[in-house]
């Protein structure tokens, strides 16, 4: 089967790899000059299935109000008055109760755990190198309440069979020696020993090269104008004066998926702006061994070979990609506070990207009402964590094979009543 994939980020490239391995003739289209030039370029670098959790959580609405008045707040909102933003935020608020949180986190952990298994298999079969480490993740708590609240997440971890260690502050240095100097500032931590880290951009670029050698065609510097469709079936992708045809089409454009599908399939994927710093390491002993998650500021600090990646925060500001100096100051403050000897902050590279987020935090993976249009988008802050599993899952569904995990609750059907274009809308769009 001929398959066109729209998007060459980590999700698009893993989809291409697994579909190619299943015997399909795959073409990837992207406006960028190469793979992983957008959100996959400089994310936090963590592969953390156990910490897969929605931003929509109990207490977040009240916290969001408090964060409005804090300099180093992890979340910022700028209302633009658009119906889509308001509808998306309302949907997110509706998911901020305990029942929805547990349900959403459960399916996110399911997909993320499966994805880690897929990555492990891929690594063993191909030998792909991406500055990966298998040293686990350590979530740090600064207050007694944070430490106590960890029991809520532990219940989900136990249900999913995810191993963990709940550590008091005196034991943090056992897994992250550099924290010995700052343990007095912390109340404890939750460690997931099976989690991993790695450079997402490097992985994506090298996997794209392997996919190309396996027969995948990459069409870079090729902006997509629109999808062409009739009778609820896609019949081509319009790119300037060219129409690229296939038997099946996969939307993996991240935050830009929503606009590209307007009038065809409405999906609740909104750009959640995040930031990162990439810092050269000065003293290896003063840097983290693996990944640290600061629960207070929602910031991750990840060790690569000779660099530290500090990433986090969320801004609901539309497609704005301006680099905000106060956000850099927050990232610098956290890494200086926890790893004062870790790296040369003055030489850091500052970056921002747009994560494609759904209101419930779970991606949308699977077929749409269109017979040959498939989705693999909406992974939010967990695109790197979920990419391999999502790609393998999509390949299995599209190929008619039985997937290794349940997947019905990952499809767009769960949003159909709230995000669905009318028949009149679709007919109008089809004739424009």
Curated annotation (Swiss-Prot):
Flavoprotein listed as a keyword: yes
Pfam entry (one): DAO
GO cellular component: cytoplasm; plasma membrane
InterPro entries the UniProt entry points to: DadA, FAD-dep_OxRdtase, FAD/NAD-bd_sf
UniProt-recorded Gene Ontology molecular function terms: D-amino-acid dehydrogenase activity
Binding site for FAD: 3-17
Pathway, per record: Amino-acid degradation; D-alanine degradation; NH(3) and pyruvate from D-alanine: step 1/1
Record family assignment: Belongs to the DadA oxidoreductase family.
Function: Oxidative deamination of D-amino acids.
Entries under PANTHER family matching the protein: D-AMINO ACID DEHYDROGENASE, SARCOSINE DEHYDROGENASE-RELATED
Name this protein carries in UniProt: D-amino acid dehydrogenase
Upper lineage: Bacteria, Pseudomonadati, Pseudomonadota, Gammaproteobacteria, Enterobacterales
């Amino acid at each position: 089967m001929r398959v066109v994939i729209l998007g060459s980020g980590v999700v698009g490239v893993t989809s291409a790899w697994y579909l190619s391995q299943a015997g399909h003739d795959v073409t990837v289209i992207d406006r960028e000059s190469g793979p992983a030039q957008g959100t996959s370029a400089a994310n936090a670098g963590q592969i953390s299935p156990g910490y897969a959790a929605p931003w929509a959580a109990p207490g977040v609405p009240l916290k969001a109000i408090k964060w409005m008045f804090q300099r180093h707040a992890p979340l910022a909102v700028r209302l633009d008055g658009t119906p889509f933003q308001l509808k998306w935020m309302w949907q997110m608020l509706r998911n901020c109760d305990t029942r929805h949180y547990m349900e959403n986190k459960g399916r996110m952990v399911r997909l993320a755990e499966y994805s880690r298994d897929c990555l492990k298999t891929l690594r063993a079969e191909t030998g792909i190198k991406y500055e990966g480490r298998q040293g686990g993740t350590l979530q740090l708590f600064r207050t007694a309440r944070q430490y106590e609240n960890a029991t809520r997440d532990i219940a989900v971890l136990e249900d999913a069979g995810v191993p963990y260690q709940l550590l008091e502050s005196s034991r943090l240095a056992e897994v992250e020696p550099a924290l010995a100097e700052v343990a007095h500032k912390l109340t404890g931590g939750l460690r997931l020993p099976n989690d991993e880290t790695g450079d997402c951009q490097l992985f994506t670029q090298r996997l794209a090269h392997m996919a190309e050698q396996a027969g995948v065609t990459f069409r870079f510097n090729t902006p997509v104008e629109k999808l062409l469709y009739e009778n609820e079936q896609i019949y081509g992708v319009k790119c300037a004066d060219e129409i690229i045809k296939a038997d099946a089409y996969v939307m993996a454009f991240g935050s830009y998926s929503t606009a590209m599908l307007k009038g065809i399939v409405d999906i609740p994927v909104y750009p959640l702006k995040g930031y990162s710093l990439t810092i050269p390491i000065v003293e290896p002993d003063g840097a983290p061994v693996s990944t640290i998650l600061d629960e207070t500021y929602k910031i991750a600090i990840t060790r690569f070979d000779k660099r530290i990646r500090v990433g986090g925060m969320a801004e609901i500001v539309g497609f704005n990609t301006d680099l905000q100096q106060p956000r850099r100051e927050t990232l610098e403050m956290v890494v200086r506070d926890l790893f004062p000897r870790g790296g040369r902050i003055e030489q850091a590279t500052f970056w921002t990207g747009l994560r494609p987020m759904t209101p419930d935090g779970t991606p949308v993976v699977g077929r749409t009402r269109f017979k040959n249009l498939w989705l693999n988008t909406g992974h939010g802050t967990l695109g790197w964590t979920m990419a391999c599993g999502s790609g393998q899952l999509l390949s299995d569904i599209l190929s008619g094979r039985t997937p290794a995990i349940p997947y019905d609750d990952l499809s767009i059907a769960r949003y159909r009543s709230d995000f669905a274009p009318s028949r009149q809308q679709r007919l109008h769009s089809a004739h424009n």
